[in-house]
């Protein structure tokens, strides 16, 4: 449950259980509630996954909207129901109490938020092969992990966005740092163009990449 008692939906491939030994691909959208492009991508992906269940061999977990409080707010907010930027709240070795503004508030302590705690627990429980989270800002594929990770290249080839090693500025307490540096789980961050007027174009940008994965 979110800080405002909203349910956070989770879906997974029918052949797997939420326990160790399945090494799924763990994916999520809506980390920042004011980035609807990431939710649109997750929803398109979920439709495709459910329509092609018998063809997909990979184990997968998908959370369409992690920050349901921020996404449901009017206006939508980057932060969660407690005013915390979830992608600055992971218990990473580089977590910092400092932030460059209210939108980036990292929380009172590392891993303080229920959404972050749920992802950390899910990572420990299922030991994902790698993770993909969906955002929107400037178009790019951010890979924190082995530079030859083929899945990142599939996505890059599908959408035409370059693979970058970081977003271009420090992100203490981020999933990228916690996942790869601290846990050795490769992290792919999809950054779609922000403020799109037509969200229906998002899923087609990445469909071929996910089919190849």
Which residues make up each language-model segment?
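A short acidic-Thr-Gly-centered motif at the start of a beta-strand
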Residues: 13-21
């Amino acid at each position: 449950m979110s800080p405002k008692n909203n349910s956070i939906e989770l879906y997974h491939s029918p052949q797997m259980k939420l326990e160790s030994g399945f090494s799924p691909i763990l994916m999520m959208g809506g980390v920042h509630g004011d980035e609807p492009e990431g939710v649109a991508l997750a929803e398109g992906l979920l439709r495709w996954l459910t329509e092609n269940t018998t063809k997909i061999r990979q184990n997968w977990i998908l959370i369409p909207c992690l920050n349901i409080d921020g996404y449901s707010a009017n206006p939508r907010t980057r932060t969660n129901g407690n005013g915390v930027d979830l992608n600055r709240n992971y218990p990473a070795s580089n977590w910092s109490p400092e932030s460059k503004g209210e939108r980036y508030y990292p929380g009172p302590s590392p891993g303080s938020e229920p959404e972050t705690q749920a992802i950390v627990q899910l990572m420990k429980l299922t030991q994902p092969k790698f993770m993909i989270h969906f955002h929107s800002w400037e178009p790019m594929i951010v890979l924190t992990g082995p530079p030859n990770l083929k899945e990142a290249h599939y996505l890059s080839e599908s959408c035409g966005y370059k693979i970058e090693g970081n977003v271009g500025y420090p992100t203490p307490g981020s999933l990228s740092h916690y996942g790869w540096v601290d846990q050795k789980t490769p992290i792919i961050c999809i950054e779609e163009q922000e403020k799109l007027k037509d969200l229906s174009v998002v899923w087609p940008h990445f469909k071929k990449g996910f089919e190849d994965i």
